[in-house]
UniProtKB/Swiss-Prot annotation:
Record-linked InterPro entries: FAH, Fumarylacetoacetase-like_C, Fumarylacetoacetase_C_sf
Name of the protein: Uncharacterized protein AF_2225
MF-aspect GO terms: catalytic activity; metal ion binding
Keyword Zinc-finger part of the UniProt annotation: no
Name of a matching Pfam family: FAA_hydrolase
The organism's place on the tree of life at top rank: Archaea
Binding-site positions, a divalent metal cation: E97, E99, D128
Transmembrane domains' residue ranges: none
The entry's keywords: Metal-binding
Family the entry assigns: Belongs to the FAH family.
UniProt key word Ribonucleoprotein: no
Amino acid sequence: MLGRFVANGRIYEGSFEIDGELLVFDGYEVPLTAVKFLPPVVPSKIIAVGLNYIDHAEELNMPVPEEPILFMKPSTAVIGHDDCIILPQISQRVDYEGELAVVIAEDCRNVPETNAADYILGYTCFNDVTARDLQAKDGQWTRAKSFDTFAPLGPYIAEIDDPSKLGIQTRVNGKVVQKSNTSNLIFDVFQLVSFVSSVMTLKAGDVIATGTPAGVGMLKDGDVVEVEIEKIGILRNTAVKIDRQIRCEC
């Protein structure tokens, strides 16, 4: 695993292992209960992909896109594991969207699909939080996708040889609301790295969010949302209304 975390009042960054209830880092063992995971990277940009699961396209009764549909989320929206998703007053419907995220290893441009794996640092969980009513109102996605706290990322980066058959599910208050597999991606991870890098330079630490499966839905004040991906782990966040509590410990 790769990532950033706080333990004993200090910030650590690098490679570590999780052994049961312990985090093992540079020869030291720290109870996971004493660890606060930070966002594993601070990307220069987040490139997200719309309508990239077959089951999600079927759910919306929309045709499969001929090429990836790209949009951006700002790095200022990033939060980590156990941080709070702030539900803005201006929106009456904020949705979860559990996703697999690809973390770029080094600066790259025009990467061939066959070489894409060489430029991937690893994979992590992502939640493409969206103010759905604003998305519909605006007719484009920037405002709806860009509020602070609307890009939960983590808890850490896993190095995975084959990301093509990973189980993915999202839970709200313990109830499974999304369940799929990355084998249902319309454009796979390597296709996405190649396509995105043909459009823009990818910087080390940049994130490509690969799209969400069927089952997106609304978050309410106090909801606990978890995105779990096979071979990676669980990203957990709590939704909080901004008029109730601006800063929270959760």
